Amino acid sequence: MKVSIIGTGKIGTDLLYKLIKIPEYEIVAFVGRRDINKSIPTNVTYYSNGIKFFIDNPKSCDIVFDCTDAYSARENAKVFRNQGIYTIDLTPSKIGRLCVPNINCDCLHNIDNVNMITCGGQVSLPLLKYLKSKCNISYAEVVSQISSDTAGMATRINIDKYIETTESAIQTLIGVNNCKVILNVNPSPKTVMQTTIFIKTNQKVIFEDYDLFIKKTQNYINGYTSDVRPVYIKDNIVMVSVKVYGSEDYLSKYAGNLDVINCAAIEVSKKIFDIRNDKVDNHKNIYEIILDV
């Protein structure tokens, strides 16, 4: 399958180093908007003319990973749609269908643009789905912390969209309408990505299979690690916390926030690859087993 990446910042470059490990994928182009000032694999071709590359080379790939920013992605999507290129959008643009691999990969049929929400969304939504399978949730608060070293220009541009899109995904995919999302950027370069969730519930339950949930989520996010198991800090409030370590393909282990969205995007691309090769049942979400829902 022919794939391209537009956006050559930290997410795009880390994604590139992950994709070159997949033998079924041919990387057609790594596309930015300025001269490249970093080393990239010699077998990858870099283009500095941005979206114009795709305009000048229509239908050059089957899938494009958009790693730009939420505002650029909106304009890029028009070009990709006109050319019939499947877009996996790693910005919080909320243009395409919101998707988390172990929640709703069945949405990938009959669409041409899928949105990977945010790094915090990819960490918190599987956990919220697990919690909701155990108890009702009247309110959810998601607090994520990342290192400032992993927050590139596009991340800083997207802060408001990050919050808006993550909250929208919680409401849409989890069904918790009353929610709040907070993102803290820690100045320390050695800050592991951490997401802490607080939920309000009127049920007392035991989360006996929590370790199994963590293990199954690690099937595609290797660095997804339990920090604090679900615990009642008040009669009606449960707290749980996870950390995500980067796989160090290109970035450090402290870039778990970038690693998680790239891993999720690759998992989605593999699903699309299978769909195009008729390897899956079009009516079955094969990821349901991960959350046992």
Which ranges hold each PLM region?
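N-terminal Rossmann-like NAD(P) cofactor-binding subdomain of oxidoreductases
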Residues: 1-143
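Active-site-lining helix/loop region of Rossmann-like oxidoreductase modules
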Residues: 6, 122-125, 129-236, 246-248, ...
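Short, conserved aromatic-histidine micro-motifs
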Residues: 34, 146-149, 287
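Short, hydrophobic alpha-helical segments
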Residues: 269-277
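Short, highly charged C-terminal tails/helix-capping segments
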Residues: 279-291
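A short, charged
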Residues: 233-235, 277-281
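A generic structural motif
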Residues: 238-241
